[in-house]
Amino acid sequence: YQAVGIKSAAHVYFNTVPDSLTVDQSAMLVGMLQNPSRWNPMKKDTTLSLKRREVVLSQMVKYGYLSEEDYEIYRKKPRGIDFQRVSHDAGLAPYFREVLRAKLDEILNEKDESGELIRKKADGTAYNVYSDGLKVYTTIDTRIQQHAEWAVEEHLSKELQAAFFKDISRRKKENYPFYNGIADKDRERIMRQAIEGSERHMILSGKLCPDCKRPKKYISAIRRDGKEYYSCDEDKGGCGEEWEKFDEKGIEKIFNTPVKAKVYAHGAYKDTLISPLDSIKYHKAILHASLMSVEPSTGHIKAWVGGIDFKYFKFDNVYQSRRQVGSTFKPLVYATALRMGKRPEDQVSAEQICIGNWCPKNSGGGYGFYSMRCALANSVNTVSARLMNEYGVDNVVHLAKKMGIKTPLPAVPSLSLGVAELPLFEMVGATSTFANGGVYIEPTFILRIEDKNGSVIYESDPVIDQALDPNVSYQMISMMKAVVDGSCGSGTGVRLRGGRAYAGIPYPTAGKTGTTQNNTDGWFMGLTPDLVTGVWVGAQDPTVRFNSTALGQGANTGLPIYGYFMKKVYADSNIKISKGDFAKPAGYDDYKRNLNINSAADFDDLMSDDLMVNPSGEIKETEEDLGTDELNQ
């Protein structure tokens, strides 16, 4: 029950503090030390813990700590349990706290090349984050975090989830909630994995104890009175719980039989009558979201929303999840072109282009010619593909790495449309480079760790890299502002300036929407001088997706969350965030006047020693082209 140490145990079992424990309560806790599972007072067989308590009390008499008279009094007392289950699911930033716990464990157990602990106590052992009195200083701003969590809940629970249920309700019954084109074998495989991975199936198949949640190694099969059971074996350190054993046919029947159950409904649970199988399908149709917000000048993470409800969905969609990023990757392609001599005002053909057998299209047509600025504002696929073809996939990959993308990228033309599967963590870090004068600062969430005496045992030392010239970075900001401001007559992010509940933000904002193939993932990246924020929305299973592009595009899924979030942040007088414009680099006007470079090679001499140039403009396809019909969003 996560009762670690006497303080925690006193709270969990008796709802008190150590100084207030009675003799009989103390004896019961001491009795548990040898085998907490066997002597646990919460077991159905209460006689075990009472007998164990009696042993401890008798030892106290033996060694003079208790009189015979008091022994008789305490021996006859009831258990007096006031159970308080410990849960880390509630409270602010639960996803972040779990990532923090794992990172602290990594830091405190880090070793040098010789295998010695880098940070250790005076006795040479590793620090324990729970018991050694450490002080951990993080970058999270609780006020910004509260607004972020509220924004995710507001859009999904009140608007988007209902629209999604309605949108997919028209699907064939046998396919629900998956898209109609899914192959039977794929649907069956996904459902089989979901069934076997469910807690109910793991319990019924003897892989998990229903009481203490111990895994298979603690569980034994037993037979009694002609029936088979599973037992969480006490001889193996289990809790002694027993439950009926079923064969596969019995398990299948259970999964198809409606029972009273609670199902998730954003922000709450509702009681219903549903079969376990239909419950799995229902929960696969739940939309998920993540948000991360960074201060670009420091790399400090101010808000981290890894999902919609940590109690029910533990998977973190900021750090752990990797999803196709869609058009949010296009700014890196455009930045490569600017870095190698293009200008925001340059006209670029949007006519269809084929690179090998890959021929991307634009959603709703839209060919002809565009300026670089307006092509990005309208997320024109063929322009991104043409720029990738002209300036080379290797140069785009090179820049992406300098901007903090650590996940290996597919060196294929369709990378220009965002076929790469990346974590939100990396995308926000890369995008924040544009708002920080071209300087990439690795996103950081731990500032320092102090021991109980106040000595610093760890201090963050993030990677810092001048990935882009400040002038190029400022050009990118001006182009991404057109996505939101509508200065090109349109833009995929212009609804941020509209009249919807989440919109109407008047302050300078740059941005980029993203929508992946078949409306699977919706993204929005929003940039202001003091905060760069990324939002992802989608179902956990990529085969569960919107039918309608109008509903599934990033402008309708991710952007509203960003809008709700920033409106709250701007309205909070306790949060000191700039409402001004992005700072123009010194000498930028001269840079614009003098920028008349006609070849990538000349630009290389002027700007950067580490810029990789492929003069032929040809793309080296080191991997099979992934291909995509990624939407123009």
What do the PLM-derived regions correspond to, one by one?
Residues 1-210, 217-235, 401-402, 406-408, ...:
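Non-catalytic, structured segments within soluble enzyme domains
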Residues 360-364, 392-431, 438, 442-445:
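Mid-domain, small-residue-enriched loop/turn segments at the edges of structured enzyme/sensor domains
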Residues 138, 142-158, 188-212, 218-235, ...:
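A penicillin-recognizing enzyme superfamily signal
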Residues 283-289, 312-332, 345-347, 370, ...:
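Short active-site loop at a secondary-structure junction
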Residues 2, 19, 23-35, 102-113, ...:
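Glycine-rich, acidic and aromatic/proline-enriched surface loops and short helix-turn segments
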Residues 16-19, 84-96, 342-396, 440, ...:
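Conserved catalytic neighborhood of penicillin-recognizing serine enzymes
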Residues 32-42, 122-130, 357, 374, ...:
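Substrate-binding clefts and substrate-entry loops adjacent to catalytic sites
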Residues 618-633:
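Long, low-complexity, intrinsically disordered segments
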